[in-house]
Amino acid sequence: MGSPLKDFVIHARKNLLPVRDKLVFYKDGQEFLPGIQALAAPGHTVGHTIFMVTSDGKSFTFLGDLTHHQILLMEHPRMEFSYDTDPKQAAESRVKMLDMLAANKIPVMSYHYPWPGYGHVVKTGEGFHYIPEPMQMLL
């Protein structure tokens, strides 16, 4: 058994090299697929990114690992979370992105939140508040 880094590199090469011609690299702010914009939010991991999805003039943002808890890290976004690779940078990204989402009233979606994980962010003093909304389905 090797070191964790060595094992990671071995598995990454094994899994990524066969599909390297299909990989799409993107830059911060880039719409890399129609209606999908990448927004850099580093700190949880080096290249952590959240994604804004836009269709028919409506947008929502998929938060990824920006916040791991709908109350704790919303109300205290500057809190350093032990699972972030760079806790200070993660807190900076959290505040920056949540400020933008609240100011622009852009709905959010997160798999870390209770079902359906969809709602809005509002600014409250030094933090934020997540307001859940029921899932809307269009047929």
Each predicted region: which residue ranges?
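A short secondary-structure junction signal
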Residues: M1, T49-I50
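Metallo-beta-lactamase
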Residues: M1-A40, Q89-K96, A102-K105
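Residue-level marker for the onset of beta-strands and adjacent loop->beta junctions
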Residues: D28, G47-T49, G117-Y118
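Active-site-proximal beta-strand elements of phosphoester/diester hydrolases
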Residues: I36-P42, F60-D65
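Active-site acidic catalytic loop and adjacent metal/ATP-binding pocket
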Residues: P42-G43, V53
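Histidine-centered divalent metal-coordination motifs
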Residues: H44, H48, H112
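Cap/insert and terminal regions of metallo-dependent hydrolase folds
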Residues: M52-L139
